[in-house]
Curated annotation (Swiss-Prot):
The modification N6-acetyllysine is found at K608. This is Acetyl-coenzyme A synthetase. Catalyzes the conversion of acetate into acetyl-CoA (AcCoA), an essential intermediate at the junction of anabolic and catabolic pathways. AcsA undergoes a two-step reaction. In the first half reaction, AcsA combines acetate with ATP to form acetyl-adenylate (AcAMP) intermediate. In the second half reaction, it can then transfer the acetyl group from AcAMP to the sulfhydryl group of CoA, forming the product AcCoA. Its EC number is 6.2.1.1. The lineage of its organism: Bacteria, Pseudomonadati, Pseudomonadota, Gammaproteobacteria, Aeromonadales. It comes from Aeromonas hydrophila subsp. hydrophila (strain ATCC 7966 / DSM 30187 / BCRC 13018 / CCUG 14551 / JCM 1027 / KCTC 2358 / NCIMB 9240 / NCTC 8049). CDD domains: ACS (cd05966). GO terms for cellular component: cytosol. Acetylated. Deacetylation by the SIR2-homolog deacetylase activates the enzyme. It comes from the Bacteria. It catalyses: acetate + ATP + CoA = acetyl-CoA + AMP + diphosphate. ATP binds at G386, E387, P388, D410, T411, W412, W413, Q414, T415, D499, R514, R525. The gene is acsA. Keywords: Acetylation, ATP-binding, Ligase, Magnesium, Metal-binding, Nucleotide-binding.
């Protein structure tokens, strides 16, 4: 095997695993040779109100991109996550909630969760929400976030969740684009001991005249002081007190929309990624089962926020469709103590842990403090998600958190893919630190050069997927042309992931990072164009260019080149003001780590900014700038290098 270190499958894992090597090979072969037969069979993992007769109807043809799975089947997501478990698992714990404060926790059984979901579904109906309407959620990490999601699916409404860390401006943009007329929020969230002003942000977002919101349902989380609008605002607890707990699930078409989730692209405006009902849930359910080698007695903890796709697929829908116990954590992994994550593992006897490299690196920086006074002996499987994990962090996670006992499923996927595409399987895959290894069933990755020519064998190139899978996004909400343009125009006939990858002699994939203008900051995607447009909207900024630089905790940091308008001078105050400005426009995750005051930017004669050169300068690789003769003013490069050394 290539690469320096290989960790073979351990006997104690393979003995009880759902799949072994031969089983995986046979299923994978079947999935690509006859997708209709394979996915027709796998679709039975769900309960259908009307069984499908058609399975795969997809086209990647230029100008005719269309993705449909199970299109004549009818089902309901909440019925698959709740109702079907009531007879056998009604008293099993569905959600364990662990508060920001370690003294606070709650458990909800499947029966209790079902009751709460039915009630809140009736609340939505009473507020005039109909099938197909978009409901915006701007919630803290509390069980009510999952209850609201499932209530939407019960009545056929479409949820659009906005991460609680986004600013009022970013929230308003998503409310406007999705056409939401109702927002569900809380008075405040809690994170790391600090309140998050959710209701205040909603109030501010709704001052935008383009928003058309009639109702705001407010959960009382902290009891903090908030402004109240009698004509519009409703307390969650008041609304659920007067409704019936009986709400039959709506029969939805497999291709009816399930949710919209906004994600950054390489052009400025965030895209509303649209997922539909049947294929998405089949894929989330199946990937959860096999990738985490799920067994009935497992206690599963995914540390992601519901505001990100990982929270949708692997905190709520995948686990609950499998009848699992899923942990929802309000806090952060190092509060109030560095060993909080390990404490939670022990407290709830977590057997499967799914977290992000950013969290792992932050804990690694604290060494053994991260595991002090904890045993973590309940852990069986560990996972990584959000960005490629560097081998050093992988090794630390494996040795220190998992004590060399637990295989690590290093999962690669995207908001657009609905579920995991490339990942080890615990009983199947020999592990290599830093590699996402092999594709899941039905996933056909390929590497191509910049001209789109396929690259064979051990090589490096642009990562594309050559055929559809059930969890794939169907379109960009309200803009199918942008969907085709973004994902299918670079390499016609193939889905372009925007990532580069390396394939080794064993056919293992190693994700090398974005090849487009998208950053991965702490596992969160940020389009450089989005940050740049926030910067240039500042009255004193004439021009800005943003690139990613390596960051030892966040993976990538944000390096902003900023040119001021004539007559303005850089200052410490302005530096602070610009950072605050971006935080207000987008949210704290978009705050630049470095602001480089630049007299000018390197441009081609046609006016295109040469980001390749800016990346090299930002990372100090000034001896390999390549050809700069095409620049309108090559002298600008020396100036930038000089400015950087002066700033340092």
């Amino acid at each position: 095997m290539s690469e320096s270190k290989v960790y073979p499958v351990k006997a104690h894992i393979s003995n009880g695993a759902l799949l072994d090597k031969a089983g995986y090979e046979a299923m994978y072969r079947a999935s690509v040779q006859d997708p209709d037969a394979f996915w027709g069979e796998q679709g039975k993992i769900l309960d259908w109100m009307k069984p499908y007769t058609r399975v795969k109807n997809t086209s990647y043809d230029p100008g005719h991109v269309s993705i449909k799975w199970y299109e004549d089947g009818l089902l309901n997501v909440s019925a698959n996550c709740l109702d079907r478990h009531l007879a056998q698992r009604g008293d099993k714990v569905a959600i364990i909630w662990e508060g920001d404060n370690p003294a606070e926790d709650r458990k909800l059984t499947y029966r209790e969760l079902h009751t709460e979901v039915c009630k809140f579904a009736n609340v939505l109906k009473a507020q005039g929400v109909h099938r197909g309407d978009v409901v915006c959620l701007y919630m803290p990490m509390v069980p009510e976030a999952a209850i609201a999601m499932l209530a939407c699916t019960r009545i056929g409404a479409v949820h659009s969740i906005v991460f609680g860390g986004f600013s009022p401006e970013a929230l308003a943009g998503r409310i406007i684009d999705s056409g939401s007329s109702i927002v569900i929020t809380a008075d405040e969230g809690l994170r790391g001991g600090r309140p998050v002003p959710l209701k205040k942000n909603v109030d501010e977002a709704l001052t935008n005249p383009e928003t058309k919101v009639n109702n705001v349902i407010v959960l009382k989380r902290t009891g903090g002081n908030i402004a109240w609008h009698n004509h519009r605002d409703i307390w969650w607890h008041d609304a659920v007190a007067t409704v019936s707990a009986d709400c039959p699930p709506e029969a939805m078409g497999a291709e009816d929309p399930l949710f919209i989730l906004y994600t950054s692209g390489s052009t400025g405006k965030p895209k509303g990624v649209l997922h539909t009902t049947g294929g998405y849930l089949v894929y989330a359910t199946l990937t959860f089962k096999y990738i985490f080698d799920y067994h009935e007695e497992d206690i599963y903890w995914c540390t992601a926020d519901v505001g990100w796709v990982t929270g949708h697929s692997y905190l709520v829908y995948g686990p609950l469709a499998n009848g699992a116990t899923t942990i929802m954590f309000e806090g952060v992994p190092n509060y109030p103590a560095t060993n909080r994550m390990s404490q939670v593992v022990d407290k709830h006897q977590v057997s499967i842990l799914y977290t992000a490299p950013t969290a792992i690196r932050a804990l690694m920086a604290k060494g053994n403090e991260a595991v002090a006074d904890t045993s973590r002996s309940s852990l069986r499987i560990m996972g990584s998600v959000g960005e490629p994990i560097n081998p050093e962090a992988w090794e630390w996670y494996y040795r220190t958190i998992g004590e060399e006992r637990c295989p690590i499923v290093d999962t690669w996927w995207q908001t657009e893919t609905g579920g995991i595409l490339i990942s080890p399987l615990p009983g199947v895959t020999d592990l290599k630190p830093g590699s996402a290894t092999r594709p899941f069933f039905g996933v056909q990755p390929a590497l191509v050069d910049n001209m789109g020519e396929p690259l064979e064998g051990a090589t490096e190139g642009n990562l594309v997927i050559t055929d559809s899978w059930p969890g794939q996004m169907r379109t960009v909400f309200g803009d199918h042309e942008r969907f085709e343009q973004t994902y299918f125009s670079t390499f016609p006939g193939r889905y372009f992931t925007g990532d580069g990858a390396r394939r080794d002699e064993d056919g293992y994939y190693w994700i090398t990072g974005r090849v487009d203008d998208v950053l991965n900051v702490s596992g969160h995607r940020m389009g450089t164009a989005e940050i740049e447009s926030a910067l240039v909207s500042h009255p004193k900024i004439a021009e800005a260019a943003v690139v990613g630089v390596p960051h030892e905790i966040k993976g990538q940091g944000i390096y902003a080149y900023v040119t001021l308008i004539a007559g303005e001078e850089p200052s410490r105050e302005l530096h602070k003001e610009v950072k605050e400005w971006v935080r207000k426009e987008i949210g704290a995750i978009a705050t630049p780590d470095v602001i480089h005051w630049a007299e000018g930017l390197p441009k081609t004669r046609s006016g295109k900014i040469m980001r390749r050169i800016l990346r090299k300068i930002a990372t100090g690789e000034t001896d390999s700038l390549g050809d700069i003769s095409t620049l309108a003013d090559p002298g600008v490069v020396d100036k930038l290098i000089r400015e950087k050394s002066e700033a340092a």
